[in-house]
Every structure is written in C-alpha cells, then in structure tokens.
C-alpha cells in the first residue's frame, strides 16, 4: 500500500471512530440520566404496588385503554435481562478498549 492510500485509510478510520465515540458518549449520557428511573422501575416490579396493580389488571379493574405492559412479567423480565446482558457487554468492550485489543 502506498503512503497516500495508507494515510487516506487511516484518516477515514480516525473520522469514523471519532463519530462513533461521539454517538456513544451521547447514548451513555442518556443511559446514565435514566438510571434513577430504571431503579424506580426495578423497585416497583418487586413491590406490593406492582402485585396490587397486576391483580387489578387481571380483574379488569383498570381502564381498557390504559397501557399496562409494565404489568407483564415477561416484559419486565426481558428488560431486566437485557440490562444485565448490556452491562456485561459494556464491561467486555471497555476491557478490550483498555487493553487495546
């Protein structure tokens, strides 16, 4: 590979990486800002309020047009599982970045 092509290739990689890092920083900011709300959801899911709300939903005591996905055990379970897997993935990627792999 000649010098010009190599420099052009490295320039493209640098620009692409800078864009990705910028996008990731913005998403990480949103994730961090959402943590208190996510913790609130996690606490709700294991609270007596959730069980009471789910029972009311099962007994058709809530408005029919009320969005109640949060009362689905599968929905919350899937979200909590995704959170766990995402956290592991972030740690694994961070380790690779720090080791420069």
Residue ranges and their predicted role:
Residues 3-101:
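Long, low-complexity or tandemly repetitive, helically biased scaffold regions used
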């Amino acid at each position: 590979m000649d010098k010009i092509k190599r420099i052009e290739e490295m320039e493209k990689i640098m620009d692409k990486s800078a864009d990705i890092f910028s996008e990731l920083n913005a998403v990480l900011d949103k994730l961090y800002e959402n943590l208190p709300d996510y913790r609130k959801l996690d606490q709700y899911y294991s609270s007596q309020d959730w069980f009471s709300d789910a029972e009311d939903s099962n007994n058709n005591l809530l408005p029919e047009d009320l969005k109640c996905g949060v009362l689905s055990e599968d929905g919350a379970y899937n979200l909590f599982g995704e959170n766990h897997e995402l956290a592991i993935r972030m740690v694994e990627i961070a380790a690779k970045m720090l080791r420069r792999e």
